[in-house]
């Protein structure tokens, strides 16, 4: 899977700013789940 760090976010399951299954991980929004 491709991991693309995006806008910074706060851990806790923030929706970030995507309608796709992005997850907040290590302070960044990544695709799907944290590796």
Swiss-Prot record:
GO-annotated molecular function: ion channel regulator activity; toxin activity
Disulphide-bonded residues: 9-25, 16-29, 24-34
Keywords: Cleavage on pair of basic residues, Disulfide bond, Ion channel impairing toxin, Knottin, Neurotoxin, Secreted, Toxin
Recorded GO CC terms: extracellular region
Expression tissues: Expressed by the venom duct.
Propeptide, residue positions: 1-8
Principal place of residence: secreted
Localization (cell): Secreted
Record's keyword annotation contains Transferase: no
Domain of life: Eukaryota
Keyword Disulfide bond attached: yes
Membership in a protein family: Belongs to the conotoxin O1 superfamily.
Function description: Probable neurotoxin with unknown target. Possibly targets ion channels.
Comment field on protein domains: The presence of a 'disulfide through disulfide knot' structurally defines this protein as a knottin. The cysteine framework is VI/VII (C-C-CC-C-C).
Protein's name according to its UniProt entry: Conotoxin Cal6.1f
